[in-house]
Amino acid sequence: MDLLVIGGSGLLGREIAAQARRAGAAVAATFHQRAAEVDGVDWRPLDIRSRPEVAELVRRIKPSTIVNAAFRQSDWTTTADGAMHVAAAAAEAGARLVHISSDAVFAGRAASYDEECPPDPVTPYGAAKAAAETAVKGLDRGAVIARTSLIIGGGASVHERHVHALASGAAAGVLFTDDVRCPVHVADLAAALLELAGSAYTGIHHVAGRDAVSRHELGRLIARRDGLSEAALPAGLRAGSGPPGALEVRLDCTVTQSRLTTRLRGAHEFLTPVSAR
């Protein structure tokens, strides 16, 4: 087997599997509750929280490369322990590992964060992601750890669905003007991860879009692309009223982008309406 995608039924996992299949790779992917519809993929159920189950699957499939896209924001065992289980199995099997991490490992106190910046999480999810990175580095020194940001694409992301719900009145709430990230298109991210998987690079890489935008600005871009009313998207401040966490986290992807042929577009580019291109 060329590639095993852990967490293959999610937005990113599906895109990785689909791109790898189009490139001619033999692909297996795991799901926890329901398999996705990606032609030619060998779907396997997996509870990543079980170390023996992960080890047995990797021994059975014998993948050359493993991409771990599995996480659950509210579950330390899935996000942190699961990553440890995958890294241990990859190291034992001699498989190339690409572990997907998050900008949630940062507190947002710095103007920007490059690959040399140490994690300083301020949320349980960020702490779980930071712990996962530590486990991967300790168990598999040849692994790639790819930190990314908000993932957008094809109308299927949480952020896109939320914008549509707000615009239609199906959901209440606001989009924060002081919560800034570097959104990335799922197709760009998947291509970059597969490129890193096929390279000799190891260690931390930042893989996000080039534009730093607020949640509200991102919502307006999505609305503009999809022909929704931008005026229907309420704006608000996260500071002092929203959920705890970092406000502004800008990933500096300069080093990683210099190593890739895949171009990491910014939100202003990949969310441009088709009619305006």
What label would you give each PLM region?
Residues 105-146, 150-152:
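Catalytic helix-loop patch of NAD(P)-dependent Rossmann-fold dehydrogenases
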Residues 163-172, 180-207:
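Alpha-helical substrate-binding/gating segment
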Residues 1-23:
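N-terminal Rossmann NAD(P)H-binding glycine-rich loop of SDR-like oxidoreductase domains
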Residues 29-37, 48:
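N-terminal Rossmann-fold cofactor-binding loop
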Residues 190-192, 198-243:
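Mid/C-terminal beta-alpha module of Rossmann-like enzyme folds, strongest
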Residues 134-181:
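NAD(P)-dependent short-chain dehydrogenase/reductase
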Residues 42-85, 89-91:
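NAD(P)H-binding glycine-rich loop region in Rossmannoid oxidoreductase-like domains
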Residues 214-220, 235-277:
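Conserved C-terminal active-site "lid" loop/helix of NAD(P)H-dependent oxidoreductases
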